[in-house]
Structures are given as structure tokens and as C-alpha cells.
């Protein structure tokens, strides 16, 4: 099948990463523009077959809390210890994110739930220029600190072009008491 062929091609490409000795490889949710199953499959391949730490992304989009718990158990059973907990973008065709029925509205809720299960290392998104949906930058910083307070162990910065934005954001987080790695 075409999907199996695509996964195989990705695995061949991923083998090339070993020579760079990365600390970890981040695997987006719905890896390769497909379903969430590829995230688990590729993260497991990276972790178990290549021997490189994998950080699997997990989002709140379209999941109940029970579905999230099932996904967490699958990651745990596969030896995946590192997760990037994200709210996620609105589903295709939607302008705004809406809490799924019996699901999570915010990444902080997802992080808190993950922290209660299986001892995962949890990464969270950081926004040097502020989150696009929150014009209040101070409130935005408080939201990022809240992720740390409930269990995030590192912040992974969103893309930025001006280093000054990142450095000021990092310094404001430090002044606010955030003492975890910021990548």
C-alpha cells in the first residue's frame, strides 16, 4: 500500500539521522500529514529500532480524556518516555479550537493529566513572540508558566526569526521563576 511505502521511506531517511547523534527526534502528531497512528509507529521505530530518544507529540484535538489515556498507555508500552503536550490547531475547516466532548481545552490540562500517569517526560510549546490567539503577552507568559507548574519539564520554542524576541522571552520566564530547559 502507498501508506506502508511512505512509512518505509521515512524509516530509511530516519536512519540517516543516527550519524548526527541527535539528543532526540520530535515526531509531530499525525506524522507525515496522516493519522495519529503514524506518530506512534514512527516514534516507536525511532526509540526502539534506531536507539534515539523520540519525543512524540500529543494534542487535545478531537480526543476524549479516555482516548488520551489509551494513547498514553500505547506510548508507555512502546517504551516512549518523552511527550510534547500541545493543545493543537483547530481541525481542518474550523476557525477556532473547541474543547472536544469529554476532552481537554488547553495544553495545561493535558500536561496535568499526563503527569498523573506513567512518569513521562513532558515538553510544552513556548511562544517567544506570544501565542497568536492571545494578544496579552503577560497573560501569555502566565499560561506558559502554568504549564511548567503542572509538570512540563522543558519548553520548546516556536519558530522565531529575531533572536532578541527569544532572549527577552527567556529572561522574562526566568524572572517569573521558570527554571527548566528552554530549547
Each model region followed by its residue ranges:
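Short, small-residue-biased leader/transition segments that mark boundaries at the very start
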Residues: 2-8
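Glycine-rich, proline-tolerant flexible connector loops at the mouths of alpha/beta enzymes
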Residues: 22-40, 90-102, 153-169
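Active-site/ligand-binding-proximal alpha/beta "capping" segment
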Residues: 112-155
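Alpha-helix-loop-beta-strand connector modules within alpha/beta enzyme cores
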Residues: 36-56, 102-124, 167-183
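Glycine-rich anion/phosphate-binding loops
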Residues: 60-74, 101-105
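Conserved, mostly hydrophobic/aromatic
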Residues: 25, 75, 147, 151
Amino acid at each position: 500500500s502507498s501508506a506502508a511505502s511512505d512509512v518505509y521511506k521515512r524509516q530509511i531517511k530516519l536512519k540517516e539521522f543516527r550519524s548526527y547523534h541527535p539528543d532526540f527526534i520530535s515526531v509531530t502528531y499525525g506524522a507525515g500529514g496522516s493519522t495519529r497512528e503514524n506518530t506512534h509507529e514512527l516514534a516507536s521505530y525511532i526509540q526502539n529500532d534506531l536507539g534515539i530518544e523520540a519525543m512524540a507529540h500529543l494534542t487535545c484535538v478531537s480526543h476524549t480524556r479516555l482516548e488520551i489515556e489509551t494513547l498514553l498507555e500505547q506510548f508507555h508500552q512502546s517504551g516512549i518516555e518523552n511527550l510534547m503536550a500541545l493543545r493543537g490547531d483547530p481541525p481542518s475547516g474550523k476557525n477556532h479550537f473547541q474543547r472536544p466532548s469529554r476532552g481537554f481545552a488547553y495544553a495545561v490540562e493535558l500536561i496535568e493529566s499526563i503527569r498523573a500517569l506513567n512518569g513521562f517526560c513532558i515538553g510544552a510549546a513556548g511562544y517567544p513572540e506570544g501565542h497568536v490567539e492571545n494578544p496579552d503577552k503577560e497573560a501569555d507568559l502566565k499560561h506558559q508558566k502554568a504549564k511548567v507548574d503542572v509538570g512540563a519539564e522543558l519548553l520548546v520554542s516556536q519558530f522565531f526569526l529575531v533572536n532578541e524576541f527569544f532572549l527577552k522571552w527567556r529572561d522574562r520566564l526566568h524572572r517569573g521563576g521558570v527554571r527548566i530547559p528552554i530549547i
